């Protein structure tokens, strides 16, 4: 894999195609937060009740949920770029129409069309960025996560500023920004090849027959029930104008972004997925109870909502991770199935909350949201053994915990190789060849360990390469080394989201076979990303009782220290 020392390639040196899609991602992730500050103003201007206004969330999220079942089918037939453009066109049209509407019913209907466009966009945007990015897979993921964090944090601020002028402002703002992104996407994003494998329309629903995926999906539904109850109804008891609501939800969004990207992976690595989710869901239940009890105290509601951003950020990351851990199907199919169940919960919650608030009082929906968070703990507990088994590698299907698979011939016992760990990066051949020279000088064989990486972002999971491509890469290294007269063997190390865990697995493997040394290259992810989700190289250094060296083309290998 890679080391954290020195200067990493910048993920922000990208082609115009990547920046076009990344800009659209920022606007898309603004989505919910952009609308939240205008909810009270919208209700007042259109003489609508909070329960009627809540249908803006319901129509948007329910349509997004249902569309998630079909986006894989669509994109595998017309290609990622056309799917992306279709999504952007729909968002531009329906966001603009929502801004021109003079009735709450009209806005609710146009939000449904917006939700369809959103589903088409979010399901393909990450794949387009990865396919178009320079500097490798890691740089593309960093850029996408940056767009995610920026959109979540800035959305409420922009919504508050535009909403202070008119409740129509955020709708027109999205339409204009997405139109700019649409033009840039058409102009700069190249046509991408269609997938070789066409996704079945029924595949996501069939995937839900697997107990693990269904269990984690129901947990996500309950979590989203509580989350969108808070998001849809908390603005009313705050008694703030659009500008001040925007500032409150900006604080919330900053915590969501920070804890999603920086803290959730480290907590997961330290305590495990299930344990962190138990505590986190319980804390969210407490926050909802505070809002319910203090519903007539605006300051209490404001503080509780801002604090909830930390727990929401952790849950958004780890819930998807849990889904991918237990899912035995292809990850894009698992993402679609999970997105369907997740958004259904988010869509129904505001509708039910509105009916409850009308029939009782405003505190009851928040109590129900708190109960939903606690029920999510119960559902997670029913699947705890599945998550634990997945983290230990004892499940069928695609590998979800770091695992090694031998490629080519099995070496004789006691071969004590030099191990080189390298990912799908541009100079992988040069790193392997530099390590091969080091192994030859030491009189030892070389073992090439190729890192096959899967990134998990929000409800999406994407592979840098499939299993066959990773295997072919290792065989290519072995063939090249054979022509150079260097004895070598190969393995593929599968890593799903957790780089540090992959480093620990490699370190243990090196200890088990009494490897002479471990060679790594320089990280393409950068120090900030490595701090966020754990450094592969740091984990190797802390867990391997071996010499760890960094190899770079044209430079002498040098030893690393913990």
Give each language-model segment a name.
Residues 66-102:
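Conserved MFS/SLC helix-loop-helix module at the cytosolic interface between two early adjacent transmembrane helices
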Residues 68-79, 259-273, 357:
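Helix-to-loop junctions at the C-terminal end of transmembrane segments
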Residues 110-150:
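Cytoplasmic helix-loop-helix junction between adjacent transmembrane helices
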Residues 142-187:
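Helix-loop-helix hairpin linking two adjacent transmembrane segments in secondary transporters
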Residues 175-194, 377-384:
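C-terminal membrane-cytosol helix-exit motif in multi-pass small-molecule transporters
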Residues 274-319:
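C-terminal transmembrane helical hairpin of 12-TM major facilitator-type secondary transporters
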Residues 411-462, 486-489, 543:
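Small/aliphatic-rich secondary-structure junction motif
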Residues 517-543, 557-560:
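Glycine-rich, Arg-bearing micro-motifs that act as flexible, cationic patches
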């Amino acid at each position: 894999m890679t080391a954290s020392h020195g200067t990493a390639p910048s993920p922000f040196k990208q082609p115009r195609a990547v920046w076009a899609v990344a800009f659209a991602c920022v606007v898309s992730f603004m989505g919910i937060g952009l609308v939240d500050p205008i909810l009270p103003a919208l209700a007042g201007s259109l003489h609508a009740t909070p329960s009627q206004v809540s249908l803006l969330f319901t129509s948007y999220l329910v349509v997004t949920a249902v569309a998630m079942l079909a986006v894989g089918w669509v994109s595998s037939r017309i290609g990622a770029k056309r799917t992306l453009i279709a999504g952007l066109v729909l968002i531009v049209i329906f966001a603009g129409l929502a801004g021109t509407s003079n009735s709450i019913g009209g806005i609710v209907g146009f939000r449904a069309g917006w939700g369809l466009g959103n589903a088409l966009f979010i399901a393909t945007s990450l794949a387009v960025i990865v396919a178009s990015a320079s500097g490798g897979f890691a740089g593309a993921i960093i850029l996408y996560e940056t767009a995610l964090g920026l959109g979540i944090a800035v959305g409420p601020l922009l919504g508050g500023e535009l909403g202070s002028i008119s409740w129509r402002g955020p709708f027109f703002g999205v339409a204009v920004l997405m139109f700019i992104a649409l033009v840039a996407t058409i102009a700069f994003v190249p046509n991408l090849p269609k997938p070789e494998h066409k996704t079945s329309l029924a595949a996501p629903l069939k995937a839900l027959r697997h107990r693990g995926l269904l269990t984690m999906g129901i947990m996500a539904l309950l979590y989203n029930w509580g989350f969108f109850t808070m998001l849809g109804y908390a603005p009313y008891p705050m008694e703030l104008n659009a500008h001040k609501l925007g500032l409150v939800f900006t604080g919330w969004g900053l915590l969501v972004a920070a804890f999603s990207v920086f803290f959730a992976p480290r907590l997961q690595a330290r305590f495990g997925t299930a344990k962190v989710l138990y505590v986190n869901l319980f804390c969210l239940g407490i926050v909802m109870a505070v809002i319910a009890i203090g519903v007539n105290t605006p300051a209490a509601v404001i503080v509780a909502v801002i604090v909830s951003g930390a727990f929401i950020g952790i849950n958004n990351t780890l819930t998807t991770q849990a889904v991918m851990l237990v899912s035995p199907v292809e990850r894009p199919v698992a993402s679609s199935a999970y997105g369907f169940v997740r958004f259904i919960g988010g869509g129904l919650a505001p509708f039910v909350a509105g009916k409850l608030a009308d029939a009782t009082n405003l505190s009851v929906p928040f109590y129900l949201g708190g109960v939903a968070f606690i029920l999510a703990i119960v559902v997670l507990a029913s699947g705890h053994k599945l998550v634990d088994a997945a983290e230990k590698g004892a499940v069928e299907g695609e590998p979800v915990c770091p695992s090694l698979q031998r490629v080519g011939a099995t070496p004789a016992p006691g071969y004590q190789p030099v191990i080189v760990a390298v990912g799908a990066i541009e100079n992988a051949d040069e790193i392997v060849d530099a390590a091969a020279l080091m192994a030859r000088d030491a009189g030892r064989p070389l073992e090439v360990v190729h890192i096959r990486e899967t990134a998990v972002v929000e409800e999406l999971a994407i592979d840098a390469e499939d299993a066959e491509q990773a295997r072919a890469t290792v065989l290519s290294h072995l063939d090249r080394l054979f022509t150079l007269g260097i004895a070598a063997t190969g393995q593929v190390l599968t890593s799903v989201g957790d780089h540090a865990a992959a480093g620990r697995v490699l370190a243990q493997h090196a200890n088990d076979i009494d490897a002479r040394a471990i060679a790594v290259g320089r990280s393409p992810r950068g120090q900030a990303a490595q701090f966020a989700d754990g450094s592969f190289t740091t984990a190797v250094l802390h867990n391997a009782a071996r010499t760890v060296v960094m190899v770079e083309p044209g430079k002498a290998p040098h030893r690393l220290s913990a």
